[in-house]
Amino acid sequence: MKAWILLLVLTRCSWGLISADNTFSDRTIGEFRELLINTKDGALFAGSEGAIFRLWAYNINDTGENVFSKKQLILSETEESECCSTASDEKLCRPSTRFLAFTNNKDSIYVCSSVGMRPEIRVLDSISLQDQQEPRTEIGICVVDPTFNSTAVVVDNGNPEDASSVYSGIRTGMGGENHLIYRPPLTKNGKQLHASIRTIYSDNKWLNEPQFVGSFDVGQHVLFFFREIAHDNSFGERIIHSRVARVCKKDIGGRNVLRQVWTSFVKARLNCSVSANFPFYFDHIQSVKRVDKHGETFFYATFSTSETAFTSSAICMFQLSSINHLLDTGLLMEETANGQFAVTADEIPAHRPGTCSSNSHSISDTDLHFAKTHLLVSDSISGGTPILPLRDHVYTQILVDQLNNQNVIFAFDSSQQKMWKISHWKEGNEWKWNLIETQTLKTSGFRINDVALLPGEFFFATSKAGVHQFSVARCQELPSCALCSMDPYCSWNAVNSKCALKTKTNEKSVGWISSSWAGRISPECSAVEKLQVKDVYLGDGFKIQGARGGTWQKDGRDLEESQRHVATSQGELVILNVDVEDAGTYECTRNGVILMRARVVVHENCARPTSVAEYRSCQREWCKKADAYKAALNIWSDSNKKNVQCKANGPSINGL
C-alpha cells in the first residue's frame, strides 16, 4: 500500500516547450526511424522509409559534400506490385530501414532493411554510404513489421573462428509466431564455418512471446533484454516479467542434444520495484542503454506498469557484475506438473547451464538435457532504488551522458513528446538522483521513433517529420544561480547575473559559478544571489519568478493553490487581488532544495484609489510630475545645444 501512496504523491511535473535547434527533413522519403551516431567523427546516421542519411551531428542541416551523404533504397515497380498484391498493408512494401550498426571498426555500416517485405542486408561505407558488397536477402536479422519489438547486435570479435556475425532477438514466420534468439551461419571468405544457432521456438519455457528491447556484446557473452509472459494468474491474466538472457559467443550448439540450439542460454528476472511490505513492480521493460564507467558496466533501463488506468514508469540501473554473478551462481528453476521450484545446488551438474565452453560439442548429452529444462534462475537481479517513478507516463526511450561525477539521464515519452533530464550519482555506497528539468519537445506533434546522443552537446530524435536536434541544456533560460549551477552543463556569471553554457574556459574562471557536486546547488550561490523584494499594494496582482517542477512555500509552510494563488506551467507564482496576509517570504523548492526566494511587502496605507475624487487627485499629482519632467528635459536640451555650439567654435582637429 505504501508503494501506491508514494506514486500518488509524486511531485507534479510542469512542462516547458522547446523547439529543435535544427530539423532535417527530405520530402522525397517517408518516416524517419533508426539513429546511429559516431561520437568521435560527429557523424549521425538516420534510417528512414526510402533512404539512409549521413548527417553532421553539430548541424544536421549542413548538407555540404564533406559531411552529408544519402543512400537511396530502391524497390522496382514490379517488386512493389507483387508485394502489394499479397501484403496486408501496402506500407509494409515500402523500402525502409529496420536496423543500423557499426562494423569493421566503424568504417562500415551494417544495414538491415525491409524491401518489398524482404529483409535485405547491406554493408555500406561509413562516409560515402556506397555498397561495399552486394546486397543480399537474409531472414532472421530484422523484422518486416516495424511494430514488432526486435533487437540485434553486430559482434565482430569473440565468435568461433573470429568470424563476424549478428545476434538477433526476433520474430519469424508468416505471422511472426516464432520467437527466437538467433545467430545466422558463420561464414568467412565465402565459406560456411558453422551452422546457424537459435533458441527452441516451439517451447515457451525458452521464450514466451518476448518483446525485445536491447542486445549487447559484453566480453565472452551477448546479453538480451526483453519482457515476456511469466505465467497466467488465477484470473486468467497474463503476468509479464522483465528478463535478461545470456548466451556465449563460442557456442555452436550440442552434438546430439540441442543440435543447432544454444547450450549456454540462461535467463533471470529484472527487478525494478518500489520497496514496501507489498512491493510495487515495474514489470514492463521498455528500453535500455549501456554505460561503461570506472571499470564497470551498467545498464540503465526504463520500465512501466501494465497498461491500466494507473500506468506508471520508473528507471532502474543494473550492474553487469550483479547480472553475471546471479547467472553464474543462482539456483535454477525446474518446471513440473505441480508448478515451478528451485533445484538444490547439488543437483546442478558439473557443467552448469550458462557456462561457456571452448567446444560446446564436447558437452555431455546428460548435461545438455539438464540445461534444456533449467533455463531460469530462481532469484531476480535488483535494479536498486527506482529513479523518478512517475504516474501517467511511459518512458519509452533513454539516453545517458557520462560526466566526471555523475551520469545525466534523458528519459522520453515518445507518444507525448516529453523529456526528463535527471542527474544520477553515487555518494558513498548509495546511488542518488535529482530531477533537473522536464520539457515537451516540438516534433511537429509526431511520435518519437528513436533517440541518440552527442555527449555534452545535443540529443536527437526521429519522427515522421524528420530528424530533430536539441541542445542538452538551455542555460540562458535559467533565471537563478541555484537553477543554473544544478544543471551540469551550465555555469552562472556572478557579474552579469546570467546563466551560460559551461565551457573549459569559464568552468574554473573567477566570477563563474558551477556546482562541482553532482545534482547539487553550488554553495557559492548563496553569496551572490539576491533576495527578490516585491513592493505591492492592496488590490494589486503580480507574479514571482519560479522554476518548472517546483512547489511553493510561504514563511516555511506549503502554499495551497486557490483562486488568488495560481502556479503557472513555468513554475511562476501569480497572486491576484493582494491582501495584507500576502506579505511574507516565498520560496520555490524542488526535491527539498530552495531554487528561488522572494520577500513580498504589502503597503497598506497606499491603496489604489477607489473613488472619482481620489482618481482626480492622483491625476493632478501625475500632471505635476509630468510638468516637472518636461521642464527638466527642456533645460537638458538647451544645455546640450550650447555644448555642441562650443565644440563647433573651438579649435579644429588639424590645429590640435
Swiss-Prot record:
Residue ranges constituting the Sema domain according to the UniProt record: 21-472
Q: One GO CC annotation, please?
A: plasma membrane
- What residue stretches are annotated with the PSI domain? 474-523
Q: Which Pfam families match?
A: I-set, Sema
Carbohydrate attachment sites? 61, 149, 271
Q: Where is the Ig-like domain?
A: 518-604
* Disulphide-bridged cysteine pairs: 83-93, 248-356, 272-316, 475-490, 484-499
Record-level Gene Ontology MF annotations = chemorepellent activity; semaphorin receptor binding
Q: Name one GO biological process term.
A: negative chemotaxis
> Where does the protein end up?
Secreted
Q: Which keywords, in A-to-Z order, does the entry hold?
A: Developmental protein, Disulfide bond, Glycoprotein, Immunoglobulin domain, Secreted, Signal
Q: Does the keyword Disulfide bond apply?
A: yes
Q: Record's InterPro entries? A: Ig-like_dom, Ig-like_dom_sf, Ig-like_fold, Ig_I-set, Semap_dom, Semap_dom_sf, Semaphorin, WD40/YVTN_repeat-like_dom_sf
Give the signal peptide, or none.
1-20
**Role of this protein:** Regulates the formation or stabilization of cell-cell contacts at several stages of epithelial morphogenesis. In early embryonic development, required for proper ventral closure of the epidermis. During male tail morphogenesis, regulates precursor cell sorting and allows the formation of distinct sensory rays. Seems to control cell-cell contact formation through 2 parallel pathways, one involving efn-4 and one involving plx-2 and unc-129. Involved in axon guidance.
- State whether it acts alone or in a complex, and with which partners, per the record: Interacts with plx-2.
- Name the protein family: Belongs to the semaphorin family.
Official protein name in the record:
Semaphorin-2A
Specify the species.
Caenorhabditis briggsae
Q: What is the lineage of its organism?
A: Eukaryota, Metazoa, Ecdysozoa, Nematoda, Chromadorea
